[in-house]
Amino acid sequence: MSEIFDVNAAIYPFPARPVPLDTNEKAFYREKIKTLLKQRDAVLVAHYYTDPEIQALAEETGGCVADSLEMARFGNNHPASTLLVAGVRFMGETAKILNPEKKVLMPTLNAECSLDLGCPVDEFTAFCDSHPDRTVVVYANTSAAVKAKADWVVTSSIAVELIEHLDSLGEKIIWAPDRHLGSYVQKKSGADVLCWQGACIVHDEFKTQALARMKALYPDAAVLVHPESPQAVVDMADAVGSTSQLIQAAKTLPQKTLIVATDRGIFYKMQQACPDKELFEAPTAGEGATCRSCAHCPWMAMNGLRAIAEGLEQGGVMHKIHVDEELRQQALIPLNRMLDFANQLKLQVKGNA
């Protein structure tokens, strides 16, 4: 059984695109960031969906490129006292939850996520309170406040296994916030899942008819899909998985042409993993609609070179992540529960959006 809690779909205002830098400006800010990282005893951790030049700089300076949970775990193991998180705000919060002793900075605290915005804590708390018999499972793409209300936090790479486990115990589930991932998990597990009606503004735009036309142009191509995409798109996939799972699939699939339905920021690491393969973005327009995100998160795009330099240089309330200690402790409980479960399964937890 799968039900949908239907809230009004929101159209979120996108941030202004960063002013493009010329070649000299890019070189200036790259060198400035390298200097500031050393001066601030900081390490740059970047999400797969940031722009390629940011991912390259993270690797060049000894940082990492990963999903949000792995970014936080990398920061925990790194000796630097400061983490500069290039991503969206919930990723900075997750890093702070897992690394309370470290300073966590972001290029901007205004880099949002539609899944986070679409799950306000007051409304979600009321929803959970109206279904007290259900176990609350929230995706990593949520605020610290929402995580603190959950029994479990989960990433896309372990979602099916966790829901199957809870279903085997006879538990009924509240799933939040992504309706497409919730539907995918319910279909795979057969569990009783009540879904919050959120969606990723990037993955929600992938279209089946346009994808079918593209597949007709490249009949030998494999289709790789993130499960935050609509179910009809997922059904067309040769491989479905989290960010890290899609990169692994790109390496192992025999096809030399890949159509990829996720944020195009992933192409930087995916092309590294399989330099001999040709990658295409899955279409996000068609069927009477134009794209808004066009396969790239507008909030991820806020993590530019100038913004990173300003975050390191200025710090302060405009860039520093703060999570109340009581809230942090509450959010840490479901996060640790997931990590312990994963260790029991001997699975490596990676792969929220």
From Swiss-Prot:
Pfam families: NadA. Its EC number is 2.5.1.72. It is an enzyme of class 2 (transferase). GO terms for biological process: 'de novo' NAD biosynthetic process from L-aspartate. Keywords: 4Fe-4S, Cytoplasm, Iron, Iron-sulfur, Metal-binding, Pyridine nucleotide biosynthesis, Transferase. [4Fe-4S] cluster binds at C113, C200, C297. Pathway: Cofactor biosynthesis; NAD(+) biosynthesis; quinolinate from iminoaspartate: step 1/1. It catalyses: iminosuccinate + dihydroxyacetone phosphate = quinolinate + phosphate + 2 H2O + H(+). Its cofactor is [4Fe-4S] cluster. The keyword Glycosyltransferase does not apply. GO terms for molecular function: 4 iron, 4 sulfur cluster binding; metal ion binding; quinolinate synthetase A activity. GO terms for cellular component: cytosol. Belongs to the quinolinate synthase family. Type 1 subfamily. HAMAP family: NadA_type1 (MF_00567). Catalyzes the condensation of iminoaspartate with dihydroxyacetone phosphate to form quinolinate. PANTHER family: QUINOLINATE SYNTHASE, CHLOROPLASTIC (PTHR30573:SF0), QUINOLINATE SYNTHETASE A (PTHR30573). This is Quinolinate synthase. It comes from Yersinia pseudotuberculosis serotype O:3 (strain YPIII).
